[in-house]
Design a protein with these regions (language model features):
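Helix-coil boundary and interhelical linker segments in multi-pass alpha-helical membrane proteins
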Residues: 1, 124-132, 285-299, 339-356, ...
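Structural signature of hydrophobic alpha-helical transmembrane segments
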Residues: 2-12, 80-91, 133-145, 233-244, ...
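Central hydrophobic cores of alpha-helical transmembrane segments in multi-pass inner-membrane proteins
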Residues: 7-22, 36-49, 88-102, 119-120, ...
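Predominantly late transmembrane helices and immediately cytosolic-facing juxtamembrane segments
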Residues: 251, 365-369, 434-469
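Alpha-helical multi-pass transmembrane bundles of energy-transducing inner-membrane proteins
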Residues: 26-28, 111-114, 118, 122-228, ...
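C-terminal ends of transmembrane helices
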Residues: 17-27, 95-106, 148-161, 247-262, ...
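Juxtamembrane/interfacial segments at transmembrane-helix boundaries in multi-pass membrane proteins
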Residues: 54-75, 158-192, 198-254, 259, ...
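Transmembrane helix-loop-helix hairpins at membrane boundaries of multipass inner-membrane proteins
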Residues: 1-5, 19-100, 104-114, 218-224, ...
């Protein structure tokens, strides 16, 4: 079983998809149960990966390789290291919990779960692929289910619905993307942004393939024996960076993300913010850092500049939002700036923190979106000024939201605190100005999340929502408890996680530092 564990993790959702095709629509309980099992299997297997990975040996482990096309140099090559294991685990957890968060969907639940499983499997495929062809294949595969899930099961914003003239509201929504968007617009914008970035990354991958002299997409062979001309390294790194940064998303390539968050169903928002956005960071590390260490050292100061705009801009815009999902969406864009800061500092401490923070953010934002979705299902509004006082009717949901808020701003005892602290400590020596701004950004996080908490759960209660009820004992509470407990557990006992991540980060940073010292703060900018 161990030698095929990555295949089990990757293909369990796909097997679930096949089984769902044969289940009649008239049996929704069986549909949901099948989807839950398809999410549970990779979750349990991913926890096994974390504790079975040999940190002392490091490198890629649990590898599987099957030649797909010898002439083209394409192989189905799977493997994980300390960088990918946390993200595989996050993807699996959010798939499993997302199935339960979506338990009450009544509009074509079978089709919804089919696309949800495909989305999760595609993200896992990116994280476990050691062949550039399949890494890109799974990356592109993630776009289609997102488009369908947003366009079919998504929701319009309040501003869009309040505009009487449909033709006018569509035109306004297309120009001003803050409050007047349709779900179709959100789906199309997300698809266009991600596809455009993917094309840029594809150009880089094809140039690597054509100039490496190896006739292979195998990342391990390209890293060890690739002969890409030195004069192309900088260009290829920039193509990889901006191609994949569009999904990360870094400012100014971020505008699709909050729109997509607002339109998506809760479970899709969880996967979107929790793992889909991390495809960008991971792919930059896996392809750009691995193949072009010297170009990484020369150009990552650019990310140190852009990440400040992401942190501050995302936080400020989040503070002034009235839609709960827009607050969380811009919050996610802001927090991804911390990941880029950790990546830009290029030392073991900051990079370990960046990878750990990606996992931590997946859990925290998963809880936030799950709670926002539950409140919306009960009240049919995401308008913060219209809500208030729900804590008296939803004590459990309020408690989970409090844990999520605490995790989001990095309260001790949550895994977010460990990751955030490592990023700030690791980046201080290289980028002190950016680090100070990042610390101030934590204050912004407190401000907009406390404002949202007060507006939704405290203060006078709107009598229009006196009928709402708390989460049901099992279906609604289980996924929230899983995410909260995991965040707190790894916040209390982070050593195993840190050792695994450092096993993947340390040789990568050594290769980059071997190319020369990291440029001073700001680099050439």
């Amino acid at each position: 079983m161990t030698e095929h564990i990555l295949s089990i993790i990757l293909f369990a959702p796909f097997v679930g998809v096949v089984l769902l095709f044969f289940i009649p629509n008239e049996k929704p309980t069986l549909v949901r149960t099948t989807a839950a099992i398809a999410g549970l299997i990779p979750t349990l297997a991913s926890f096994y990966l974390l504790y079975a990975y040999d940190s002392a040996a490091g490198g890629y482990q649990f590898t599987e390789q099957y030649v797909w096309s010898k002439d083209l140099g394409i192989s189905f090559f799977l493997g994980v290291d300390g960088i990918s294991i946390p993200l595989v685990l996050a993807s699996s957890i959010l798939l499993f919990t997302g199935v339960f968060i979506s338990w009450h969907i009544v509009d074509r639940p079978k089709e919804f779960y089919i696309f949800l499983l495909i989305l999760a499997a595609a993200t896992i495929g990116v994280y476990v692929s050691l062949d550039l062809f399949f890494l890109y294949f799974f990356y592109e595969m993630s776009v289609l289910p997102m488009y369908v899930l947003l366009g079919v099961w998504g929701s319009h914003t309040k501003g869009y619905l309040e505009m009487a003239d449909k033709q006018k509201r569509d035109s306004v929504g297309f120009i001003f993307n803050f409050t007047s968007n349709s779900k179709e617009y959100a789906a199309m914008k997300l698809t266009l942004f991600l596809s455009a970035g993917a094309v840029v990354a594809l150009i880089a991958i094809l140039i690597i393939y054509a100039t490496s002299g190896l006739n292979t997409f195998n990342l391990v062979e390209l890293q060890a024996h690739g002969q890409v001309p030195d004069y192309l390294h900088g260009l290829l790194f920039l193509l990889i960076f901006f191609g994949f940064a569009s999904i990360a998303p870094i400012w100014p390539l971020h505008s699709w993300s909050p729109v997509g968050h607002a339109a998506a169903p809760a479970a899709v928002s969880m996967l979107h913010a929790g793992v889909l956005m991390k495809l960008g960071h991971f792919s930059i590390i896996r392809v750009g850092y691995t193949l072009f260490p010297e170009a990484t050292r020369e150009w990552m100061p650019l990310a140190a500049v852009l990440c400040v705009f992401s942190i501050v801009y995302g936080g400020l815009v989040a503070y002034f939002q009235k839609d709960t999902k827009y607050v969380i969406g811009y919050s996610s864009s802001s927090h991804m700036g911390y990941v880029f800061l950790g990546m830009a500092a290029l030392n073991v401490m900051s990079m370990t923190g960046a990878v750990l923070y990606m996992f931590a953010h997946a859990l925290a934002t998963g809880m936030l979106f799950a709670v926002a979705g539950f409140v919306y299902d009960q009240t049919h509004t995401r308008d913060i000024p219209s809500l208030g006082g729900l804590s008296s009717r939803m004590p459990f949901i309020t408690g989970i939201f409090t844990v999520a808020v605490a995790a989001s701003f990095g309260l001790p005892l949550t895994v977010n605190f460990i990751g955030e602290l490592m990023i700030l400590v690791g980046s201080w020596e290289i980028y002190p100005v950016q680090t100070i701004i990042a610390v101030l950004g934590i204050g912004l996080t407190l401000a907009y999340l406390f404002r949202m908490m007060r507006g939704v759960f405290y203060g006078p209660m709107n009598p229009h929502y006196a009928h709402v009820h708390d989460a049901s004992p099992f279906v609604d509470r289980l996924p929230l408890l899983v995410m909260a407990a995991t965040s707190i557990y790894f916040g209390l006992f982070p050593s195993q996680f840190i050792h695994v991540i450092q096993a993947g980060v340390t040789p990568l940073i050594a290769a980059i530092q071997g190319a020369g010292p990291v440029p001073p703060a700001g680099g050439p900018f």
